[in-house]
């Protein structure tokens, strides 16, 4: 990575702080407000400079489409086990304290890639691939997903587990149960945040 200017380093630090505190990156408007820029366009120019220097990667058409290569917030501690996330409060980060029901004594390294938390599954939309109501879904925190992967996604204030498919700016979140219709998202009109990938299932 090329050397950053003091202002670029400040922006990168703010992005990391947002990822750690909230679980997702800031918007251009939030960066502009935090750094005292007159408009989000100024933030956009700084982000493009950071991307050219290899400090971040940007997803076109997504207001929070900022990724820091190699940076994964909220890594679980092997000794502490994994937090079990119950119902996610509207708008709250997945790992917010009020969402954590308990801790499960299982080594995160048991999963590949390693798990960062367990999410309690609600409903039967993924039953055809063996993910059932009440199961604990092991999740690896990442903001990137490839077509066909099972993801934990946030749309607005709702969090859902579905299979990911993307073509250009269109994303489909596909259920593994014919009773559930696909969820279609146009990234130009609506924000979608990948919270993580499914890396395993625990049934108690």
Curated annotation (Swiss-Prot):
Substrates-to-products reaction catalysed: Hydrolysis of Ala-|-Gly bond in repressor LexA
Keyword ATP-binding among UniProt keywords: no
GO annotation, cellular component aspect: protein-DNA complex
SUPFAM superfamilies documented for this protein: LexA/Signal peptidase, Winged helix' DNA-binding domain
One biological process term in Gene Ontology: SOS response
Gene3D superfamilies linked: Umud Fragment, subunit A, Winged helix-like DNA-binding domain superfamily/Winged helix DNA-binding domain
Primary enzyme class: hydrolase
A molecular function GO annotation: sequence-specific DNA binding
HAMAP family: LexA
Complex formation: Homodimer.
Protein known as: LexA repressor
Record organism: Pseudomonas aeruginosa (strain ATCC 15692 / DSM 22644 / CIP 104116 / JCM 14847 / LMG 12228 / 1C / PRS 101 / PAO1)
Protein encoded by which gene: lexA
């Amino acid at each position: 990575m090329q050397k950053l200017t003091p202002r670029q380093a400040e922006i990168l630090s703010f992005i990391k702080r947002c990822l750690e505190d909230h679980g997702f990156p800031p918007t251009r408007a939030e960066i502009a407000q935090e750094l005292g820029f007159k408009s989000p366009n100024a933030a956009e120019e700084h982000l493009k400079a950071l991307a050219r220097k290899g400090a971040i990667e940007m997803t076109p058409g997504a207001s929070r489409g900022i990724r820091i290569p190699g940076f994964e917030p909220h890594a679980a501690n092997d000794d502490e086990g994994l937090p079990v996330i119950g119902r996610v409060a509207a708008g709250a980060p997945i790992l917010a304290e009020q969402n954590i029901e308990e801790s499960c004594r299982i080594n995160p390294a048991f999963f590949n890639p390693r798990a960062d938390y367990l999410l309690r599954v609600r409903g039967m939309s993924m039953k055809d691939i063996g993910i059932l109501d009440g199961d604990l879904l092991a999740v690896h925190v990442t903001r990137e997903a490839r077509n066909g992967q099972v993801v934990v996604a946030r749309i607005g204030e709702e969090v859902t587990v579905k299979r990911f498919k993307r073509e250009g700016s269109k994303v489909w979140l596909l259920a593994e149960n014919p009773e559930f219709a696909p969820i279609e998202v146009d990234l130009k009109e609506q924000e979608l945040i990948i919270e993580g990938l499914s890396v395993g299932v625990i049934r108690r």
